[in-house]
């Protein structure tokens, strides 16, 4: 029961570096992936009501997009349990992990920042450079 309660409070989202792997797995069309990669669009996806949905789209280099992603994710929120946050990555680009840690520290919300690697199944769909943030909301 306690685990189910926690699962309902967990918020998970991530930013993809490229859409090639999503297209190869059939999660988006090849044309969409090609256009997004040409324009430098980095989508932010989240699990909402048990479904994977695009939340926002960012343009630019991944470290800059990650900074915007953190701002959009955390700015003005007071419903976050600040005991810990997980940063999950799949072969992150140079500078991305530092950018995400700096962004999290800027908001001063989290006591523990824990780095994890994305597993092979999710990494196979998302591809290298994917960065995700996982935290729990307050009860």
Give the positions of each predicted feature.
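Mixed-charge interfacial surface used for oligomerization/domain docking
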Residues: 1-139
């Amino acid at each position: 029961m306690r685990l189910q309660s926690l699962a309902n409070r967990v918020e998970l989202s991530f930013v993809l570096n490229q859409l090639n792997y999503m297209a190869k797995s059939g999660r988006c069309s090849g044309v969409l992936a090609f256009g997004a990669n040409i324009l430098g669009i980095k989508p932010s996806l989240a699990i909402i009501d048990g479904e994977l949905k695009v939340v926002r789209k960012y343009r630019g280099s991944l470290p800059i997009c990650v900074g915007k992603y953190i701002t959009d994710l955390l700015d003005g929120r007071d419903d976050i349990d600040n005991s810990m946050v997980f940063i999950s990555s799949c072969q992150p680009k140079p500078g991305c992990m530092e950018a995400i840690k700096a962004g999290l520290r800027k908001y001063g919300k989290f006591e523990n920042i824990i780095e994890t690697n994305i597993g092979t199944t999710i990494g196979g769909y998302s591809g290298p450079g994917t960065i995700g943030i996982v935290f729990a909301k307050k009860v």
